A protein has these predicted regions:
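Short glycine-rich anion-binding loops that position phosphate/pyrophosphate groups of nucleotides
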Residues: 8-12
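Short alpha-beta junction capping motif
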Residues: 14-35
């Protein structure tokens, strides 16, 4: 893979991130509670709740991940106090609390909120991660996917010469 995106649902589903993922040499973006697991795997720690279930004004640093993302209010469900390792930088904050962080040398990124589908910044952040950080290209369209599937089927040796392909 060219990159990994980790998402976590609830604090009650506490898990431990296998630190070997960090040594694969591919970019990792951890969202929500997965960001807490990432910071722990990087040698940092999480403490008590800093912001809980309220809107907060977020300021973003001009980084590759947050290129073209403007600061503004966002609802934050649960934001913890983070103790960052020495080589990790704060890339977004709200009221003095770390909201996002990165280790740009190892391409490890964490954001303490989930990306919502109706938030225009979410698609920008995902695009920045996929294209600018992971080096992926936006080749996928339904026509391209169908052409690729047809090519794979025609390259395969199908007995009788017919195949049924369902797309959902």
């Amino acid at each position: 893979p060219r990159g990994i995106i980790l998402c976590g649902e609830t604090q009650s589903a506490k898990g431990v991130l296998d630190a070997q993922i960090l040594s694969l040499g591919i970019p990792v973006l951890a969202l929500g509670h997965a960001a807490h697991m990432l910071i722990a795997a990087m040698g940092g720690a999480c403490a008590g709740v800093a912001i809980s279930e309220k809107k907060a004004a977020i300021q973003y640093e001009k980084t590759r991940l947050f290129a073209d993302v403007e600061g503004g209010e966002r609802y934050l469900e649960e934001t913890l106090v983070l103790m960052l390792p020495a080589d990790v930088q704060v890339t977004a904050s709200a009221g003095g609390c770390t909201i996002a962080f990165e280790d740009s040398r190892r391409s490890l990124y964490g954001i303490q909120f989930e990306l919502e589908r109706n938030d225009p910044d979410s698609s920008t952040i995902l695009k920045n991660f996929a294209r600018d950080i992971c080096g992926c290209s936006p080749w996928f369209t339904m026509d391209a996917a169908l052409a690729q599937a047809r090519q794979k089927l025609s390259d395969a040796s199908i007995e009788g010469g017919y195949a049924v392909c369902g797309v959902s």
